[in-house]
From Swiss-Prot:
The lineage of its organism: Bacteria, Pseudomonadati, Pseudomonadota, Gammaproteobacteria, Vibrionales. Substrate binds at residues 159, 238. NADP(+) binds at residues 13-16, 41-42, 162-163, 316. Keywords: Amino-acid biosynthesis, Diaminopimelate biosynthesis, Lysine biosynthesis, Methionine biosynthesis, NADP, Oxidoreductase, Threonine biosynthesis. Catalyzes the NADPH-dependent formation of L-aspartate-semialdehyde (L-ASA) by the reductive dephosphorylation of L-aspartyl-4-phosphate. Homodimer. This is Aspartate-semialdehyde dehydrogenase.
Length: 316
């Protein structure tokens, strides 16, 4: 009989936590016992998992000694408090927040890109999960990086409101309904109205004029590729789409490569679905519920001898 694990999801009632629950079930992960954890406010809420009803427990009162693996998605402050305590007690923590991503002794892992880094979890019993926009970009760029190297990445993201959690989803839905019925939109989650609008700000602005979301893509790319020489120039935009992120990616490679070669490599890469010719993926039509990274509009840069353009879409 294969090994089974007792798994805890901390932040189980959030948008990401609920998706974690769905993925564990869909992938038939070998779960022996499942524990759903959240704040006292969500205690008692129930979910179905593998034909059973599982009740959400208060994290403050939970006995962690029975847990082997914990998936954290309850926010950076809570991860900062709980993850080291639980990891030191022997729980393997996989953290979905940004809190541990830049610690030198904690692996930042995309299984399709740097699976060898997983072994470093033994340093502190914590594995960090990269930002969603970084993940889809690097899955698409990994074959190019391995083949000819990458000098520079210019990327503009078009990120759905679900990246801001349930609050973002509710705000887009609420604003859209009000505006279509002739009422003014109320703005709480985003810096400006998101319905029928695009906002070139995700997270706070930093001293260099970039947002923190944009700098995450810089730092994470360099760490995951273990290559601090890669230059990354991102602009991150929140768009009025409920689910799925899209990215217009331009790379300057260290040696020239033809777009046909790039497409052939992508077509043979696990985890990528390639769209050729005039067909291209979109968040609404193609990305929902898919694990693959979708790539289209692959073409050589007409202004640079070592440039390649890609359109990259994924369910965040």
């Amino acid at each position: 009989m294969s090994q089974q694990f007792n798994v805890a999801i901390f932040g189980a009632t959030g948008a990401v936590g609920e998706t974690m629950l769905e993925v564990l079930q869909e992938r038939e992960f070998p779960v022996d016992e499942l524990f759903l954890l959240a704040s006292e406010r969500s205690e008692g809420k129930t979910y179905r998992f593998n034909g059973k009803t599982v009740r959400v427990q208060n994290v403050e009162e939970f006995d962690w000694s029975q847990v082997h693996i914990a998936l954290f998605s309850a926010g950076g402050e809570l991860s900062a408090h709980w993850a080291p305590i639980r990891a030191e007690a022997g729980v393997v923590v996989i953290d979905n927040t940004s809190h541990f991503r830049y610690d030198y002794d904690i692996p930042l892992v995309i299984p399709e890109v740097n699976p060898e880094a997983i072994a470093e979890f033994r340093n502190r019993n914590i594995i960090a999960n990269p930002n969603c926009s970084t993940i889809q970009m690097l899955v698409a760029l990994k074959p190019i990086y391995d083949a000819v190297g990458i000098e520079r990445i210019n990327v503009t993201t078009y990120q759905s409101v679900s990246g801001a959690g349930k609050a973002g989803i509710d705000e887009l839905a609420g604003q859209t309904a009000k505006l279509l019925n002739g009422y003014p939109a109320e703005t709480n989650t985003f810096s400006q109205q998101i319905a029928f609008n695009c906002i070139p700000q995700i997270d706070q602005f930093m001293d260099n004029g970039y947002t923190k979301e944009e700098m995450k893509m810089v730092w994470e790319t360099q760490k995951i590729f273990n290559d601090p020489s890669i230059m990354v120039n991102p602009t991150c935009v929140r768009v009025p789409v409920f689910y799925g992120h899209a990215e217009a990616v331009h790379v300057e490679t260290r040696a020239p490569i033809d777009a046909e070669q790039v497409m052939d490599m992508l077509d043979q890469t696990d985890g990528i679905e390639l769209f050729r010719g005039a067909d291209f993926p979109t968040q609404v039509r193609d990305a929902g519920g898919k694990d693959h990274v979708l790539v289209g509009r692959v073409r050589n840069d007409i202004s640079h001898h070592s440039g390649v353009n890609l359109w990259v879409v994924a369910d965040n």
